[in-house]
Amino acid sequence: MRPSKRAANELRPLSFTTQFTRYAEGSVLVTLGNTKVICNASIVEGVPRFLKNSEQGWLTAEYGMLPRSTHSRMDREASRGKQGGRTVEIQRLIGRSLRAALDLKLLGPYTITIDCDVIQADGGTRTAAINGSCIAMIEALRHLQRKGILQTDPLKHKVAAVSVGIYKGVPVLDLDYAEDSNAHTDMNVVMTDNDAFIEIQGTAEGDAFHAKELDALINLARHGIKQIIEKQQEALS
């Protein structure tokens, strides 16, 4: 029995609140069970120096957790003077995942910056951030289209992410903190809306896992991501 009493293939309650903040071109509050993340997409004209004269746009992401998003307060990374390795890893994952959704040539000389701020963490913050950021990014692209800046939509695919793992010997979907901290295997999967993989991150925390278990986890992830993409579409319609 899972701590949340969910079935093995059951997602936590998931919702997206669009236009959550006033000023960003795209803004979403994603709620995944007790995990809550604000995802804002901002657009500026210009691209990083390494893309000068490349005739393509760029997307980058930043990720952070509020000091009391967890059970006990943690210092802001700014007060420590540097980002932690986990933060850097997650924001790179978000950026890679969303760039895979875009034709950057069609974006033109613009940079989209995604800001993900975790306001409450109960496992799955990186996957929730990707799911909310995809919607915020699409809202930002629609903003450019309404202004007549983009003539062709650069969006190739929606993207979504979910965690899977082996908890008490059973493959389960969408781990919360209680499960994640006790899982034998933990995996994050990012996919497109045409059933293609962007990233698979998997680690055995105790016993090694076998190909049969890997297949079960991948199938669980595909099942969950299909539902998440349906929720994204509902939020955007």
Curated annotation (Swiss-Prot):
Its EC number is 2.7.7.56. It is an enzyme of class 2 (transferase). It comes from the Bacteria. One of its GO terms (molecular function) is 3'-5'-RNA exonuclease activity. Phosphate binds at R86, G124, T125, R126. Phosphorolytic 3'-5' exoribonuclease that plays an important role in tRNA 3'-end maturation. Removes nucleotide residues following the 3'-CCA terminus of tRNAs; can also add nucleotides to the ends of RNA molecules by using nucleoside diphosphates as substrates, but this may not be physiologically important. Probably plays a role in initiation of 16S rRNA degradation (leading to ribosome degradation) during starvation. Pfam families: RNase_PH, RNase_PH_C. The lineage of its organism: Bacteria, Pseudomonadati, Pseudomonadota, Gammaproteobacteria, Legionellales. Homohexameric ring arranged as a trimer of dimers. The keyword Protein biosynthesis does not apply. SUPFAM superfamilies: Ribonuclease PH domain 2-like, Ribosomal protein S5 domain 2-like. It comes from Coxiella burnetii (strain RSA 331 / Henzerling II). Belongs to the RNase PH family. The gene is rph. The keyword RNA-binding applies. InterPro entries: ExoRNase_PH_dom1, ExoRNase_PH_dom2, ExoRNase_PH_dom2_sf, PNPase/RNase_PH_dom_sf, Ribosomal_Su5_D2-typ_SF, RNase_PH, RNase_PH_bac-type, RNase_PH_CS. Keywords: Nucleotidyltransferase, RNA-binding, rRNA processing, Transferase, tRNA processing, tRNA-binding. NCBIfam families: RNasePH. It catalyses: tRNA(n+1) + phosphate = tRNA(n) + a ribonucleoside 5'-diphosphate. GO terms for biological process: rRNA catabolic process; rRNA processing; tRNA processing. This is Ribonuclease PH.
